[in-house]
């Protein structure tokens, strides 16, 4: 996740970058040889956010099937911190895991600029798995020379998660179908937020952060930061402009809790009931469960997202050239991304499959935690209708700078024009 953005059900350790590097330097890298070591093999996997493998019991299941394999996972909560650490380790050639996670906003950069630092999975037979994945998921991880640098774990079709208890106390409807009609457009969603604010229980906000609005609105368009020719167009993109304006509107209306996503205060806000709605890709369901805990069971629900269908996040598993256990690593990622495991992952955690056979299997899935919401139908419909986004090498960098600028609007009251100027400067500094 994305994501996977940041992309999920995690109590991931803050500051885990340094810990991960230390552990992986000891057990995850070394010679480029890919052969099996004698005796029991420890396969290291380094991720960000929550991929859900551990939470869904998949590691334990794999270890039972392969008693000579032990899986050791390290993770970093914030993807941008993870990515910076990964780039440092790739440049230095040390501290890399046998398997590294890659967010969808980074996969084009890996495929186009860093494919020489990762194994071509075709060499291990990955070409035979192509039929399992959606065309866009497979294509994004394919380099110009045909090398496949990663296997997809999930997609991020979007919906709206909301607290039924808070909406009820504010005198608003709680039925998911009624709400879907009331917020069929983003303007309708903001207008409903204004109504919520008048009778908001406690000090609760309508939404956690306007970053949530921006990311999900932008995720509903094919072109965001790059056009089909690979040209960077973010500052003239209609999709970015629409997402920016709606986010600023929500900030000025005082609808945001001004929470920094993925921060400790954001995590605590789930359990505290500090906000009523959260635009949520499928992988966010597991994150909500992890942070809201038992106290949130049955209070959350899921409805169709305002506007049109969109996608936020989704991830890949890749094998660095410096992996010590390449064959074992490939067998593990092949198994983790297989239709059977992607089906289990969605049913247990909420990560929506990027596997075509798995998508067909989860259509009838409901989630008791989210008021028995038909998540298979809601996210399945979004996945089917969402545009295939054009990905660029610096998608995630651009998005982070825009998010920082919007945070100034909701936290400091910075004007839209000034914040936009700051975003442009930030992007220029980030990518040159």
Region annotations inferred by a language model:
Residues 2-109, 130, 324-328, 340-344, ...:
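Conserved N-terminal structural module of periplasmic/extracytoplasmic solute-binding proteins
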Residues 75-88, 104, 182-188, 258-272:
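Short helix-initiation/N-cap motifs at beta->coil->alpha
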Residues 109-114, 138-177, 209-229, 311-319, ...:
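Periplasmic solute-binding protein
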Residues 190-194, 229-260:
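Glycine-centered hinge/linker elements that transmit conformational signals in sensory
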Residues 371-426:
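C-terminal capping/gating helix-and-loop segments adjacent to ligand/active sites or protein-protein/ligand interfaces
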């Amino acid at each position: 996740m994305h994501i996977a953005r940041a992309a999920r059900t995690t109590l991931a350790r803050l500051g885990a970058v340094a810990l991960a590097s230390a552990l992986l330097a000891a057990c995850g890298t070394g010679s480029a040889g890919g052969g099996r070591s004698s005796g029991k093999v420890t396969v290291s996997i380094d991720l960000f956010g929550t991929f859900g493998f551990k939470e869904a019991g998949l590691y334990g299941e794999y270890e039972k099937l392969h008693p000579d394999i032990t899986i050791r996972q390290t993770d970093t909560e914030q993807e941008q911190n993870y990515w910076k650490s990964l780039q440092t380790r790739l440049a230095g050639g040390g501290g890399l895991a046998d398997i590294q996670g890659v967010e969808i906003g980074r996969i084009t950069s890996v495929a186009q600029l860093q494919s020489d630092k990762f194994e071509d999975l075709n060499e291990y037979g990955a070409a035979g798995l192509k039929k399992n994945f959606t065309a866009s998921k497979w294509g994004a991880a394919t380099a110009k020379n045909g090398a496949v640098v990663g296997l997809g774990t999930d997609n991020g079709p979007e919906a709206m998660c909301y607290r039924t208890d808070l909406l009820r106390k504010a005198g608003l409807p709680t039925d998911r179908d009624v709400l879907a009609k009331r917020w069929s457009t983003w303007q309708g969603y903001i207008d409903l937020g204004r109504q919520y604010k008048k009778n908001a229980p406690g000090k609760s906000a309508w939404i956690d952060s306007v970053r949530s609005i921006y990311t999900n609105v932008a995720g509903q368009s094919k072109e965001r930061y790059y056009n089909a020719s690979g040209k960077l167009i973010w500052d003239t993109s209609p999709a970015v402009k629409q997402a920016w304006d709606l986010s600023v509107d929500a900030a000025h209306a005082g609808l945001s809790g001004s929470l920094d996503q993925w921060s400790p205060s954001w995590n605590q806000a789930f359990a505290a009931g500090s906000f009523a709605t959260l635009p949520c890709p499928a992988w966010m369901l597991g994150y909500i469960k992890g942070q809201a805990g038992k106290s949130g069971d049955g209070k959350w629900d899921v409805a169709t997202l305002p506007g049109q269908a969109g996608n936020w996040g989704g991830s890949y598993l890749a094998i660095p050239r410096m992996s010590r256990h390449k064959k074992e690593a490939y067998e593990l990622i092949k198994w983790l991304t297989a239709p059977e495991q992607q089906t289990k992952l969605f049913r247990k955690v909420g990560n929506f499959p990027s596997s075509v056979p798995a998508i067909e299997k989860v259509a009838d899935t409901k989630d008791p935690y989210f008021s028995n919401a038909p998540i298979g139908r809601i996210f399945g419909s979004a996945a089917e209708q969402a545009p295939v986004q054009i990905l660029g090498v610096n998608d995630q960098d651009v998005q982070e700078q825009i998010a920082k600028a919007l945070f100034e609007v909701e936290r400091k009251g910075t004007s839209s024009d000034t914040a936009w100027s700051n975003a442009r400067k930030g992007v220029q500094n980030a990518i040159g």
